[in-house]
Regions:
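OB-fold and OB-like single-stranded nucleic-acid-recognition modules
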Residues: 1-171
Length: 171
């Protein structure tokens, strides 16, 4: 399974490590850790992206804060049960990590490809600044009967187009 490429869920992000590795859980003797990376947008804003990393990919006892890395893997979700409600937690599940000297300039450093099924009717709306957006909830299937539920936003003419998607439609 570790060699298998999942084609319906692929993500690559480049950013600066912002935290130490924090233990998350263990599966079949393999420890998994969370780390945050700061990823730049085209607008020069940044997002703090949580990344789940196997202890077999990198030395999780080292402090890599300030280091630039490229992470390739999948976008995953799970429900965290908090008191009276569930909270959808999103993260990148790292399959490969590469340490790079510096963040490259250019628009093509971060990308994501998701293929799945619409869970809810899209919500089309205009922001207070007049921008058209559509909120989507996409179910992306994984092996062994699991799925990741990924909220997505479409902008502009893509928002108008996506507003016509039906529940259960393959997108």
């Amino acid at each position: 399974m570790s060699d298998k490429i999942i084609e319906n869920n692929q993500v690559t992000v480049i950013g600066e490590v912002m935290s130490e590795f924090v233990y998350s859980h263990e599966v079949f003797g393999e420890g998994f850790y969370m780390v945050d990376i700061l990823v730049k947008r085209l607008s020069n804003s940044s997002d703090r992206i949580p990344v789940m990393v196997s202890e077999r990919l990198v030395d999780v006892t080292e402090d890599y804060r300030g280091t630039c890395i490229m992470v390739s893997g999948q976008f995953r979700s799970y429900n965290r049960h908090e008191e009276q409600k569930n909270r959808l937690v999103l993260s990148v599940f790292a399959r490969e990590i590469e340490f790079i000297d510096e963040e490259p300039d250019g628009a093509k450093t971060n990308h994501i490809l998701l293929e799945g099924y619409m869970c809810k009717k899209p919500v089309y709306r205009k922001t207070p600044l007049g921008r058209e957006i559509a909120d989507l909830l996409l179910a992306v299937n994984r092996p062994y009967g699991k799925s990741d539920y990924i909220p997505c936003i479409c902008w502009g003419r893509n928002a108008r187009y996506a507003s016509g998607f039906e529940v259960g439609e393959h997108v």
